[in-house]
């Protein structure tokens, strides 16, 4: 099973790529994290947020792995703990489908894409820099995996 992160946004600062890569490389081969950056739509004057999100939705849908479980990151999503994520990983692995985590652009994810998702997940109640989300998600996926392996990385 692969863990795909589809993130609207590109040309991130080097420290974002370094942070993401650090956690991605720690993952075992059977839970490899793959990042796909989606080029954001131009936010020209007169163009509505809905129009921008709809265009980004099409790009995300084109990049989605076939038959993947879709987890859309959204501020109104389920507020899971790290332990809940750790409990979900083995279940998802047994299911055999890849998991695609969707990170929207500046305006978020298109409502139709959120409706299509298998789950909406909130990363934090805090307002975070957009680029930081991919690093936090990669770290939490790594932490969740270490919990399933009784690895000492996670301490309570």
From Swiss-Prot:
Q: What class of enzyme is it?
A: transferase
Cellular component, GO annotation? cytoplasm
An example of a Pfam family matching this protein is: SPOUT_MTase
On the tree of life, the source organism's domain of life is Bacteria
Q: Which amino acids does the record list as binding S-adenosyl-L-methionine? A: 73, 104, 123-128
| Catalysed reaction equations from the record | pseudouridine(1915) in 23S rRNA + S-adenosyl-L-methionine = N(3)-methylpseudouridine(1915) in 23S rRNA + S-adenosyl-L-homocysteine + H(+)
Ranges annotated as spanning the membrane: none
Question: Where does it localize?
Answer: Cytoplasm
Q: How does it assemble?
A: Homodimer.
Role noted for this protein:
Specifically methylates the pseudouridine at position 1915 (m3Psi1915) in 23S rRNA.
Name of the protein in question: Ribosomal RNA large subunit methyltransferase H
Supply the source organism for this entry. Paraburkholderia phymatum (strain DSM 17167 / CIP 108236 / LMG 21445 / STM815)
What gene name is given for the protein in this entry? rlmH
